[in-house]
Regions:
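C-terminal substrate-binding/catalytic lobe of Rossmann-fold NAD(P)-dependent oxidoreductases
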Residues: 7, 12-64, 143-185
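Extreme N-terminal starter segment of soluble prokaryotic enzymes
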Residues: 1-5
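Rossmann-fold NAD(P)-binding glycine/threonine-rich loop
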Residues: 77-90, 97-120, 126-138
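Short, surface-exposed loop/turn motifs that are enriched in glycine and acidic residues
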Residues: 120-128, 155-162
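Short, ordered loop/turn segments at secondary-structure junctions
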Residues: 35, 99-101, 123-124, 153-155
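Structural detector of well-ordered beta-strand residues that form the stable sheet scaffold
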Residues: 30, 58, 95, 117-119
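Rossmann-like NAD(P)-binding element
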Residues: 61-81, 92-93
């Protein structure tokens, strides 16, 4: 059984991941962690995922040191300013489920990945990855003097723009195969 704490537990993605994890037999959600100052610290996660789960929301990553893996759904600023050094100290595997990192942030994360296993997944949608594979296929088939434009629209509460939904297609499609790939968010 995998023991994992979940950071960013009170957000949209965090709540969804947490609910799915809680309904699996092979995963034990060991902690629900929110950022310091979050008004839900001290509350129970049942407020977000249903009443059958009894786990308090805490705000201290270091309390969760006996976990097997961290899943972070916070945001780039919280990750880099508050959590990065704590993950480095904990030395545990890490899933980063947020976007909007700067180039400098990505370099720091790459450095951290030399010491601990890291998986970055800024988008958990199977549809996006199917879209990327389809895009790769068509990019190889089209004439090289054709421009491709991908326009991304989000709800008005989107906090991490540009999101991986817009970044991933251009990053995954080889630019050698593309004359121009323009992503607009």
């Amino acid at each position: 059984m995998i023991r994992k704490p979940k950071l960013g537990s009170t957000g949209k993605l965090g709540s969804t991941i947490m609910k799915n994890a809680l309904n699996r037999k092979d995963i034990e959600l060991s902690y629900a962690i929110a950022r310091k100052g979050n008004p839900f610290v001290g509350h129970n996660i049942s407020e977000f995922v249903g009443d059958k789960f009894n786990l308090p929301i805490i705000d201290d990553i270091e309390t969760a040191k006996n976990c097997d893996i961290f899943i972070d759904c916070t945001n780039a600023e919280t990750f880099m300013n508050d959590s990065y050094s704590k993950y480095e100290k904990a030395g545990k595997s890490l899933v980063i489920a947020t976007t909007a990192f700067s180039v400098e942030d990505i370099e720091k994360i790459r450095k951290l990945a030399t010491n601990i296993p890291i998986f970055m997944a800024g988008n958990f949608s199977i549809a996006l990855y199917n879209f990327i594979e389809t895009l790769k296929f068509y990019v190889k088939k089209i004439n090289l003097d054709t421009d491709i434009q991908i326009i991304e629209y989000h709800h008005n509460q989107k906090k991490d723009a540009p999101s991986d939904t817009s970044i991933a297609p251009s990053a995954k499609v080889s630019l050698d195969d593309t004359w121009c790939l323009n992503v607009t968010t």
